[in-house]
């Protein structure tokens, strides 16, 4: 997978540069340059034209956020942020994603050399996946941002036409008590935010989001979605309950199960059971328990990500009578999870990211007769 990948490693710590470079080299990745700060990283990218950059967040002269912004403006290259596991770094890491970084990998605390060695396979796999991203082609954000409160338009008419206020032929209305389960991994945070920004509150969805992300970051991620969408979104806690117009983000290092469902409200349970598909939280866990528990309309959505997590969950949702959607290859940062889901034969619709919110709405509307 890593054969032929060329990387620049940027970190102000000589020790960390050496550890990261050795891990990548042992994994078959050619480290063409190392950089001590953001300015050196920008110069190295322009000179060497690598396939990927691993970028520390806090560096002298120019930090990782500024360097990422410069790289995207001057020589667009996939950037993987390497962030310390702190609340402060969570904030700046998400800022780097806003500037164009594809994803992030958390550097361990404690005995770094031992921990990095333990995580070496994950790091090599993630660097290789990020290197394959076409940063100029994926993740369009048209129709988001300042337009986040605007109801999207679909083939059945605008969402404002679906509120059931009219009875003329051709109008549609939302089904009662729909639930949406979203799963994503590499490259997913921006994609999830885009989908959520474009879901109208009138749809009254219950939304469960599983993004492969460590502790310390999922809370910040939930806050960002809450700010940018019309839905009330928070990080899941054990026993949390939500109804229409509300959402939960699975907490880092915890599986999120749907424990029970009654009268349009669902309750979640968090566990530290063994990782599923080598990850925790796992999309499959939430989708499978949702399919078993929820007896109202259910939609499963798989966005960009590496691996196969979510494929079995999509199968379970389809078998339970739910609707299923996967992101297309052209707009996925990494076409792993959506591909595996589609290969099950249980995906109803494959859509580009800009059409997914509309696609979700199409699954939860019905024509008024």
From Swiss-Prot:
GO CC annotations, alphabetized: cytoplasm
Subcellular localization: Cytoplasm
Annotated catalysed reactions: [protein]-L-glutamate 5-O-methyl ester + H2O = L-glutamyl-[protein] + methanol + H(+); L-glutaminyl-[protein] + H2O = L-glutamyl-[protein] + NH4(+)
Residue numbers bearing the 4-aspartylphosphate modification: 56
Keywords: Chemotaxis, Cytoplasm, Hydrolase, Phosphoprotein
The protein's Enzyme Commission number: 3.1.1.61, 3.5.1.44
Top EC category: hydrolase
GO BP: any one term: chemotaxis
PTM: Phosphorylated by CheA. Phosphorylation of the N-terminal regulatory domain activates the methylesterase activity.
The name this protein goes by in its record: Protein-glutamate methylesterase/protein-glutamine glutaminase
Organism of derivation: Haloarcula marismortui (strain ATCC 43049 / DSM 3752 / JCM 8966 / VKM B-1809) (Halobacterium marismortui)
């Amino acid at each position: 997978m890593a054969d032929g990948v060329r990387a620049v490693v940027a970190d102000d710590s000589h020790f960390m540069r050496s550890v990261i470079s050795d891990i990548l080299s042992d994994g078959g990745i050619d480290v063409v340059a190392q950089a001590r700060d953001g300015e050196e990283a920008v110069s190295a990218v322009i000179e060497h034209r690598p396939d990927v950059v691993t970028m520390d967040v806090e560096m002298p002269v120019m930090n990782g956020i500024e360097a990422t912004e410069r790289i995207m403006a001057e020589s667009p290259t996939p950037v993987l942020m390497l962030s310390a596991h702190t609340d402060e770094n969570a904030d700046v890491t998400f800022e780097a994603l806003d500037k164009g970084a594809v994803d992030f990998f958390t550097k361990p605390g404690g005995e770094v050399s031992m921990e990095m060695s333990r995580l070496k396979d994950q790091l090599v796999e993630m660097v290789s996946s990020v290197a394959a991203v076409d940063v100029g082609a994926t993740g369009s954000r048209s129709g988001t941002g300042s337009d986040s409160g605007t109801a999207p338009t679909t083939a059945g008419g605008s969402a404002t036409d679906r509120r059931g206020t009219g009875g003329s032929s051709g109008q549609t209305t939302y089904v009662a008590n729909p639930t949406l389960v979203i799963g994503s991994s590499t490259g997913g945070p921006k994609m999830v935010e885009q989908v959520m920004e474009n879901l109208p509150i009138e749809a009254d969805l219950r939304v469960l989001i599983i993004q492969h992300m460590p502790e310390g970051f999922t809370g910040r991620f939930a806050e960002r979605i809450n700010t940018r969408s019309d839905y009330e979104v928070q990080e899941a806690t054990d026993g949390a309950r939500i109804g229409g117009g509300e959402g939960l983000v699975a907490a880092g290092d915890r599986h999120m199960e749907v424990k029970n469902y009654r009268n349009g409200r669902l309750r979640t349970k968090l566990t530290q059971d063994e990782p599923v598909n080598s990850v925790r939280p796992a999309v499959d866990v939430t989708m499978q328990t949702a399919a078993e528990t929820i007896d109202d309309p259910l939609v499963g959505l798989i966005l960009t990500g590496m691996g196969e997590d979510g494929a079995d969950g999509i199968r379970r949702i389809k078998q339970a009578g739910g609707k299923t959607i996967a992101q297309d290859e052209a707009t996925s940062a990494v076409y792993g999870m959506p591909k595996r889901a589609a290969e099950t034969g249980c995906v109803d619709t494959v859509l580009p990211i800009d059409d997914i919110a509309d696609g979700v709405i199409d699954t939860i509307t019905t024509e008024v007769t």
